[in-house]
Protein backbone atom coordinates (compact mmCIF):
# COMPACT_ATOMS: atom_id res chain seq x y z
CA UNK A 1 0.00 0.00 0.00
CA UNK A 2 1.13 3.53 -0.76
CA UNK A 3 0.01 6.39 1.50
CA UNK A 4 1.06 9.99 0.89
CA UNK A 5 -0.30 13.37 1.89
CA UNK A 6 -0.55 16.39 -0.36
CA UNK A 7 1.53 18.41 2.11
CA UNK A 8 4.43 15.95 2.15
CA UNK A 9 4.42 15.76 -1.65
CA UNK A 10 4.34 19.56 -1.96
CA UNK A 11 7.44 19.75 0.22
CA UNK A 12 9.44 17.42 -2.01
CA UNK A 13 10.80 17.04 -5.54
CA UNK A 14 7.27 15.94 -6.54
CA UNK A 15 6.23 19.63 -6.72
CA UNK A 16 7.04 21.13 -10.14
CA UNK A 17 6.60 24.89 -10.67
CA UNK A 18 6.19 26.56 -14.07
CA UNK A 19 5.31 30.11 -15.15
CA UNK A 20 1.58 29.35 -15.52
CA UNK A 21 1.06 26.42 -13.17
CA UNK A 22 2.41 24.23 -10.43
CA UNK A 23 1.81 20.52 -10.13
CA UNK A 24 2.25 18.17 -7.19
CA UNK A 25 2.75 14.71 -8.62
CA UNK A 26 1.46 12.38 -5.93
CA UNK A 27 1.63 9.13 -7.92
CA UNK A 28 4.27 8.55 -10.60
CA UNK A 29 5.51 5.93 -13.04
CA UNK A 30 7.91 4.38 -10.52
CA UNK A 31 4.94 3.63 -8.23
CA UNK A 32 3.94 0.97 -10.81
CA UNK A 33 0.21 1.69 -10.85
CA UNK A 34 -0.09 2.24 -14.62
CA UNK A 35 -1.15 5.89 -14.28
CA UNK A 36 -0.01 9.05 -12.53
CA UNK A 37 -2.07 11.35 -10.30
CA UNK A 38 -1.40 15.05 -9.77
CA UNK A 39 -2.93 18.04 -8.02
CA UNK A 40 -2.27 20.99 -10.32
CA UNK A 41 -2.90 24.69 -9.78
CA UNK A 42 -3.37 26.82 -12.89
CA UNK A 43 -2.42 30.38 -11.97
CA UNK A 44 -5.04 33.09 -12.40
CA UNK A 45 -5.18 35.10 -15.64
CA UNK A 46 -2.96 32.65 -17.55
CA UNK A 47 -3.23 30.78 -20.84
CA UNK A 48 -1.28 27.58 -21.41
CA UNK A 49 -0.92 25.80 -24.75
CA UNK A 50 -0.97 22.02 -24.23
CA UNK A 51 -0.81 19.11 -26.65
CA UNK A 52 -0.23 15.75 -24.99
CA UNK A 53 0.83 13.70 -28.00
CA UNK A 54 2.13 10.87 -25.81
CA UNK A 55 -0.40 10.83 -22.97
CA UNK A 56 -4.12 10.69 -22.29
CA UNK A 57 -5.40 12.85 -19.43
CA UNK A 58 -8.55 13.28 -17.39
CA UNK A 59 -8.94 16.46 -15.32
CA UNK A 60 -11.42 17.26 -12.54
CA UNK A 61 -11.80 20.89 -11.40
CA UNK A 62 -11.86 21.15 -7.61
CA UNK A 63 -11.90 24.96 -7.38
CA UNK A 64 -11.59 28.11 -9.47
CA UNK A 65 -12.91 28.99 -12.90
CA UNK A 66 -11.61 29.08 -16.44
CA UNK A 67 -12.06 27.47 -19.82
CA UNK A 68 -10.56 24.97 -22.23
CA UNK A 69 -10.42 25.73 -25.94
CA UNK A 70 -9.81 22.80 -28.27
CA UNK A 71 -7.69 23.96 -31.23
CA UNK A 72 -10.02 24.08 -34.24
CA UNK A 73 -13.00 23.28 -32.05
CA UNK A 74 -15.16 24.44 -29.20
CA UNK A 75 -14.50 26.29 -25.96
CA UNK A 76 -15.89 24.82 -22.74
CA UNK A 77 -16.27 26.55 -19.37
CA UNK A 78 -14.52 24.97 -16.40
CA UNK A 79 -15.81 25.36 -12.84
CA UNK A 80 -15.81 23.15 -9.73
CA UNK A 81 -17.33 19.79 -10.57
CA UNK A 82 -16.29 19.86 -14.26
CA UNK A 83 -14.48 16.82 -15.65
CA UNK A 84 -12.82 16.93 -19.04
CA UNK A 85 -11.11 14.03 -20.75
CA UNK A 86 -8.42 14.47 -23.40
CA UNK A 87 -9.03 11.11 -25.07
CA UNK A 88 -7.81 12.04 -28.55
CA UNK A 89 -4.52 13.77 -27.68
CA UNK A 90 -6.50 17.01 -28.10
CA UNK A 91 -4.38 20.12 -28.67
CA UNK A 92 -5.86 22.86 -26.50
CA UNK A 93 -5.50 26.09 -24.58
CA UNK A 94 -6.22 26.05 -20.86
CA UNK A 95 -7.16 29.41 -19.35
CA UNK A 96 -7.73 30.40 -15.74
CA UNK A 97 -9.79 33.53 -15.31
CA UNK A 98 -8.54 36.63 -13.52
CA UNK A 99 -8.86 36.26 -9.72
CA UNK A 100 -9.79 32.59 -10.21
CA UNK A 101 -6.83 30.22 -10.12
CA UNK A 102 -7.97 26.66 -10.79
CA UNK A 103 -7.07 23.63 -8.70
CA UNK A 104 -7.35 20.42 -10.69
CA UNK A 105 -6.99 16.69 -10.01
CA UNK A 106 -5.28 15.11 -13.04
CA UNK A 107 -4.74 11.50 -14.10
CA UNK A 108 -2.24 10.61 -16.86
CA UNK A 109 -1.85 7.43 -18.87
CA UNK A 110 0.84 6.38 -19.46
CA UNK A 111 2.13 7.69 -16.16
CA UNK A 112 4.71 10.45 -16.11
CA UNK A 113 8.04 10.12 -14.32
CA UNK A 114 7.69 13.37 -12.39
CA UNK A 115 10.02 16.01 -13.80
CA UNK A 116 8.24 16.60 -17.13
CA UNK A 117 7.33 20.11 -18.22
CA UNK A 118 5.68 21.18 -21.47
CA UNK A 119 8.06 21.69 -24.38
CA UNK A 120 7.67 24.50 -26.95
CA UNK A 121 4.80 22.55 -28.57
CA UNK A 122 2.94 21.95 -25.30
CA UNK A 123 4.03 18.29 -25.20
CA UNK A 124 5.32 16.14 -22.34
CA UNK A 125 8.03 13.81 -23.66
CA UNK A 126 7.53 10.08 -23.35
CA UNK A 127 10.20 8.98 -20.87
CA UNK A 128 11.14 5.33 -20.27
Swiss-Prot record:
The Gene Ontology biological process terms listed for this entry are: ectoine biosynthetic process
Which SUPFAM superfamilies does the annotation name? RmlC-like cupins (SSF51182)
- Which Cys residues form disulphide pairs? none
Its UniProt pathway annotation is:
Amine and polyamine biosynthesis; ectoine biosynthesis; L-ectoine from L-aspartate 4-semialdehyde: step 3/3
Write out the entry's keywords from A to Z: Lyase
Q: Which family does it belong to?
A: Belongs to the ectoine synthase family.
Role this protein plays:
Catalyzes the circularization of gamma-N-acetyl-alpha,gamma-diaminobutyric acid (ADABA) to ectoine (1,4,5,6-tetrahydro-2-methyl-4-pyrimidine carboxylic acid), which is an excellent osmoprotectant.
Put simply, this protein is called L-ectoine synthase
Organism for this UniProt entry: Vibrio atlanticus (strain LGP32)
